[in-house]
Amino acid sequence: MIPGLYSAATAMDVTDRRHEMVAENLANLQMPGYRRRIVSQSNFDTLLRPLRQSTDGVDSSKLLGATADPARYDFSQGNIQDTKRQLDVALNGDGFFTVQGSSGPLYTRSGAFHLDPQGTLVTQDGLSVLGQGGSIQVPGGVTESQVEIAADGSVFAGDQQIGQLALTRFADNSVLTAVGASLFAAGSNAVPTATSAEVLQGRLEMANTSSVTELINLISISRHRDAAQKALNAIADTIQKRIGLR
């Protein structure tokens, strides 16, 4: 009986974790470059089937509890929107923009850049956007509207090339660890390579999820939690009957 009780309780715990991920995804729907978080629940229906088929609700000798796979990020391409803003750029294809973090390079899909008071190309958080030779500096007197960014990441101020965006790709994105809503750090075993992604000026890649997708997930999570709650109640009732409390 106890394994069945444990199974239903852990199933509820897993659905709570999935709910947290969906809530985070919904909170970041408007965040450029945000990558959707996913927690998969392993074999939920398989785990509950013995409870549903049991005549007394406690035939659970083979149940060990629902399990959740580790949270992971979905790095699929998000929708690209036109902004007509010169320093908004999006990547079409695999890869990341490289920016300077406090402890080394960080990687992002968000290309919402601007110039700081010193004329340095920076992110919304004020981190320097890295080029092939370091930060990208726009000459004095050049405005944002005069900056051109080519498809290969070359950055021009008028007719003068002032840098080229450092674009990075990883063979396995699972080596990346989130350090912010749209920033990632690479592990020591990560091997960065060049990418052939196309840079699109005047556009932004948005979060790679939608309110419809996440609301559908919420409905599914709610149904799974209700099923686990019913199983838990059935087991608890049977236990109480068998020990003479009812």
What do the predicted segments below correspond to?
Residues M1-R246:
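Amphipathic alpha-helical polymerization modules
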